[in-house]
Amino acid sequence: DLPHPQQARSQRRLACEQAWQNSGLPIQILRLPGIYGPYRSVLQSINTRRSKMIDKPGQVFSRVHVDDIAGATLHLIQCAAAGKWPVVVNVTDDLPAASKDLLTYGAKLLGRSLPPLEPFAIAAKQMSPMALSFWQENRRVSNQLLCQELGYSLIHPDYHSGLRDCYLVEGFKALQTNPL
């Protein structure tokens, strides 16, 4: 699918991609959605009690674990050496999800409670312009080209696997003896 960004920041990003494509240089654009990994996940905000459970029905975001960014990059280098060189590749996991779903799963891993669910209309009043723009678009992207056509096998196919990895790497075992 061709992107149809609504936000100015997303439109600038697409214009930058198009400029690179028109440069005549041998390029490959890796589109990365929400990036997370050890020491950069919802586990920190839950553990420090800074998380907000925002409810915006129908709102989902695609994400990717840093292990899969590295793995997909290496895989695409091998594909290029074999003559497969798509110009634009989405690097994302298989399960776009609402932010509240990640927080709920992260809280289960940590054995922590979460704040009450807050409707987006209320939460938006306290958001920065950058945060607000992030929530204005659905950010669901497909990894079909990467996984089905180019044969990359995800290390973390969904946020469950990715957050379990973060949990183990970050040493949260001390907080709960039976992680999910």
Residue ranges of predicted features:
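Residue-level signal for the nucleotide or nucleotide-sugar donor/cofactor binding architecture
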Residues: F61-V64, A97, V141, P157
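Conserved beta-loop-beta element that borders a ligand/cofactor-binding pocket
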Residues: A15-Y39
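Active-site "gating" loop of Rossmann-like NAD(P)-dependent oxidoreductase/epimerase domains
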Residues: D1-Q11
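A short C-terminal helix-loop "cap" of Rossmann-like NAD(P)-dependent dehydrogenase/epimerase domains
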Residues: I46-K56, G111-P116
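Amphipathic terminal alpha-helices
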Residues: P157-L180
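Substrate-positioning beta->alpha
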Residues: I29, I35-S45, I54-I77
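Conserved C-terminal active-site "lid" loop/helix of NAD(P)H-dependent oxidoreductases
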Residues: T104, A124-S153
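Mid/C-terminal beta-alpha module of Rossmann-like enzyme folds, strongest
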Residues: A70-A72, L76-A131, Q176-L180
